[in-house]
C-alpha cells in the first residue's frame, strides 16, 4: 500500500499503472465518474545512480538511488529483500522493490505504508476504456471544476 505524502497533494491519487517492460509501454488508468478511463504511453527510461547510503523502511534494509525524470531530481529507496524491479507510479529499474520515492522539493512523494495481502478483484488492463492522455486530463479537470462549483462538502474522489 503506497500513499502520496507530497507537500502539495491536490486530492487523493487513485490511479493504476500497468507496465509492460517487454514493450517499454505503460497504461495509465483512473476511474472518473464510474468509468475506468486510461491511455497508453511509452515507459520513460530511468537512468539510476546507486548511492551507498542506507536506511530502514518498515522492516526492510533499503539503499538509496537517484535519477532525473520530468525535469526533476528524484531520490528512491529500494530493498534487495524483495527482488522485484518495480515501484510506484512510473518508477522502476532498480535491483529491488522501490519502497519510497520523492523529488528533491517534495512535490511528489510516494511512500510504502504496508504490504497487505488482500482478497479483492483486480482490475485488468482490458477493463480500461482507452482514450488520449489529453482527453483524460480534460475529463478529470471538468469533474474537478464541477465539484468546486457545487456545494459538495465531501471530496467524492476520495474512497471511504
Model-found features: residue ranges?
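Extended soluble regions of mature proteins
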Residues: 1-160
Amino acid at each position: 500500500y503506497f500513499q502520496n505524502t507530497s507537500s502539495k497533494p491536490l486530492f487523493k491519487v487513485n490511479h493504476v499503472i500497468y507496465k509492460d517492460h517487454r514493450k517499454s509501454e505503460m497504461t495509465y488508468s483512473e476511474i472518473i465518474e464510474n468509468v475506468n478511463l486510461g491511455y497508453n504511453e511509452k515507459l520513460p527510461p530511468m537512468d539510476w545512480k546507486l548511492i551507498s547510503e542506507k536506511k530502514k523502511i518498515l522492516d526492510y534494509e533499503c539503499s538509496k538511488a537517484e535519477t532525473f525524470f520530468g525535469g526533476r531530481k528524484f531520490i528512491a529507496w529500494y530493498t534487495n529483500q524483495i527482488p522485484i524491479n518495480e515501484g510506484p507510479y512510473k518508477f522502476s529499474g532498480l535491483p529491488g522493490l522501490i519502497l519510497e520515492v520523492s523529488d528533491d522539493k517534495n512535490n511528489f512523494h510516494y511512500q510504502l505504508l504496508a504490504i497487505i495481502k488482500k482478497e479483492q478483484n483486480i482490475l485488468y488492463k482490458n477493463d480500461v476504456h482507452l482514450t488520449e492522455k489529453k482527453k483524460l486530463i480534460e475529463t478529470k479537470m471538468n469533474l474537478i471544476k464541477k465539484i468546486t462549483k457545487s456545494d459538495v462538502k465531501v471530496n467524492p474522489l476520495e474512497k471511504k
